[in-house]
Amino acid sequence: MDIRREVLRNVTLCQALEPLGQKPGLTSRAEDASPGTKLEYFVIAGVNSAWAFYDLADRVLAAGRQPDCIFDLAYEAQAASVRGRLGGKVNYGQINLLTPLVTAQVLIFLEAGTTSDVEAILARTPEVLRHTTERDVESLERFIHLGYDLSARQHERMGRPKPLQRPHLQGRYASVWEAAQDFLHVHAVAEYTQGYPYCRRIYRFLLHNLEIGMLPASELIYRFLLPEVGRADVLADMISVGLYLVLTRHPETVLFP
């Protein structure tokens, strides 16, 4: 198995598939999408950004350990995501969640030669964050600021300029883990510092409901978790990660009969 190609495939698929499910409370992107959330924006962003995750897997393999920096590739993924489209930072949250997850996955592949143990991958992510560096903190800040820039441009195009408060991390924290402790109110940060509890629940639900189909199952878990999570866009990002985990667990299974 070429883990780099598997990562590329699954990152592409999970981001392209997630918006195909019908989710009440979230724009039906195929029918009544707002100017910033057209279905094609999500598909294009997912395809464009996936190659950075191929590079991330390749970097971990080449180093034989966790590299000195991984979040620069989150920045590269977000920068690439806008090629050929308008819209805002439509897959920002997915990139943020997938970066430490893919790193953990490839590290486990180096150690065990397999990627089928999803629970081990999820459990490894806090350790990945603890082993990040000041270079990661700098890159994470650039990634966050780029997301703010993309959002601001979209608001300007829509005639609704919106002032944004940009967090500043560089020079204040020695690792992404350390920085995360001051931002646990952010859904994605709480998720990846705690081993992805919501993504795990979504993954398990999808896994146990494969007979009804991945997309119908994703619609059901969305309805179930939305009152608890409270934000439709955040939950959509988590569902994308859940899809990624099922694709990782079942690389050869027919999941879309």
What are these regions (language model features)?
Residues 86-100, 229-244:
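Conserved phosphate/anionic-ligand binding catalytic regions in large, soluble enzymes, centered on
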Residues 76, 80, 100-104, 124:
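Generic beta-strand or strand-like secondary-structure segments
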Residues 68-86, 226-229:
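Short, hydrophobic/aliphatic alpha-helical segments
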Residues 1-68, 106-229, 246-257:
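Phosphate-rich cofactor/ligand-interacting catalytic cores and adjacent structured alpha/beta frameworks
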Residues 72-76, 92, 119-123:
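Alpha-helical scaffolds flanking conserved acidic
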Residues 81-88, 92, 105-112:
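Amphipathic alpha-helical interaction segments
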